[in-house]
Amino acid sequence: MTTGGHGTDGVERRGLMFVLSSPSGAGKTTLSRLLIERMPGLRMSVSATTRPMRPGEVDGRDYLFVDKPRFEAMVRDDELLEWATVFDNRYGTPRAPVEAALSAGQDVLFDIDWQGTQQLREKARADVVSVFILPPSAGDLEKRLHSRAQDSDEVIRKRMSRASHEMSHWAEYDYIVINHDVDEAFAEVQSILKAERLKRERRIGLVGFVRGLQGQLQG
């Protein structure tokens, strides 16, 4: 039996997996943060990773930091919904907490690349809503990468080279947002999430709700 939580109108619904992907520097991390801050009922998926912890990060909040043998065991035991290798580090989404959230009617936000999105679709297509964020220009993307001041020139060159390959998968996504301005891009992404929450097939309580209305009218 499918379970779910209640939307703002009181109708029970199943949660969804809301995916944001983009080349590094196109704005998906900022947009993800704004969504978590401003959209009730949305929680961030916490990925497992083999990369080293960065200053200010907290294990279990930002990522689940694991070593390579543990990550390989998670892949082998089908504990991950998706996983990918990025710049020699592995990232993956633990299955159990996501499935529990969806069943409770909570939406889960994913900040993952095209490989992870493809794997999510293969395992749970009906639950996935995907958005690809594009920069307004290549020059703007490079400027943003330099302004972050967290990567060397060599790493930035690699990210720019990888960006073209990542963008080649744009047509695999449900929605495309061009991030000219972060406030405008956020408004567009927020509108997508609000509309997807109202999809008939996710609102599993509608059958009972409509029958109740019909009963009132016929009584």
Swiss-Prot record:
Keywords: ATP-binding, Cytoplasm, Kinase, Nucleotide-binding, Transferase. Gene3D superfamilies: Guanylate Kinase phosphate binding domain, P-loop containing nucleotide triphosphate hydrolases. Pfam families: Guanylate_kin (PF00625). InterPro entries: GK/Ca_channel_bsu, Guanylate_kin-like_dom, Guanylate_kinase, Guanylate_kinase_CS, P-loop_NTPase. Its EC number is 2.7.4.8. It is found in: Cytoplasm. It is an enzyme of class 2 (transferase). Residues 15-194 form the Guanylate kinase-like domain. The keyword rRNA processing does not apply. One of its GO terms (molecular function) is guanylate kinase activity. Its main location: cytoplasm. GO terms for cellular component: cytosol. It catalyses: GMP + ATP = GDP + ADP. ATP binds at S22, P23, S24, G25, A26, G27, K28, T29. Essential for recycling GMP and indirectly, cGMP. Belongs to the guanylate kinase family. This is Guanylate kinase. It comes from Bradyrhizobium diazoefficiens (strain JCM 10833 / BCRC 13528 / IAM 13628 / NBRC 14792 / USDA 110).
